[in-house]
């Protein structure tokens, strides 16, 4: 039974859990996200950014890929929401590279993976998670998961400024 959540941190016990039903490309990132909560990073967007930083600094290619994959998907989703034609152009056949094919394949597999679990239980789980986050101070609820794109942009700009 999948409730639409890839992980949960239980503050009372300090226990971080990652769902066995999460998509393979997201597993390492999800592990780092929940570990970030365990280390005291409560805000979802901050836990996402911390997970990205941990994954991207890892020598393990699975962790590094998972971090960059999730960062790409978050940025792509923000682009698609605000500039759909640019997002379409980014994925166009004219811009195909081996790396892009791998990422697109994983995006499609991840989408198929979660679509298989969609339904009443998943919707109820997302509603509960949204209420839970709002109760504990995340005003944007589940929308806060995507807000880490601002952190990624600021981090990348800081790297460029330092060069």
Name what the model sees in each region:
Residues 99-163:
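Pan-zinc metallopeptidase signature
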Residues 45, 70, 84-85, 122, ...:
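Generic alpha-helical secondary structure signal
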Residues 7-15, 32-37, 84-92, 107-116:
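Phosphate-binding glycine-rich loops and adjacent basic patches that engage nucleotide phosphates
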Residues 29-31, 48-54, 76-78, 82-85, ...:
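Generic detector of ordered, mature protein regions
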Residues 1-73:
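Acidic/His-rich structured neighborhood in mature extracellular/periplasmic domains
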Residues 20, 39, 43, 54-59, ...:
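Sec/Tat-exported extracytoplasmic proteins
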Residues 49-107:
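Active-site/pore-lining binding-face segments in mid-to-C-terminal subdomains
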Residues 1, 12, 27, 39, ...:
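Generic detector of leucine side chains in alpha-helical contexts
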């Amino acid at each position: 039974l999948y409730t639409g959540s890839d992980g949960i941190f239980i503050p009372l016990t300090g226990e971080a859990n990652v769902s066995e039903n999460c998509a393979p490309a997201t597993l390492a990132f999800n592990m780092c996200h929940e570990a970030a909560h365990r280390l005291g990073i409560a805000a979802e967007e901050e836990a996402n950014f911390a997970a990205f930083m941990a994954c991207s600094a890892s020598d393990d290619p699975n962790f590094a890929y998972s971090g960059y994959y999730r960062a790409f998907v978050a940025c792509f989703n923000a682009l698609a929401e605000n500039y759909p034609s640019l997002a379409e152009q980014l994925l166009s056949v004219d811009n195909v590279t081996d790396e892009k094919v791998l990422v697109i394949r994983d995006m499609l597999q991840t989408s198929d993976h979660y679509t298989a679990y969609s339904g009443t239980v998943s919707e109820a789980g997302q509603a509960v998670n949204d209420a839970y986050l709002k109760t504990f101070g995340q005003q944007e609820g589940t929308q806060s998961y995507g807000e880490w794109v601002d952190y990624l942009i600021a981090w990348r700009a800081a790297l460029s400024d330092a060069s």
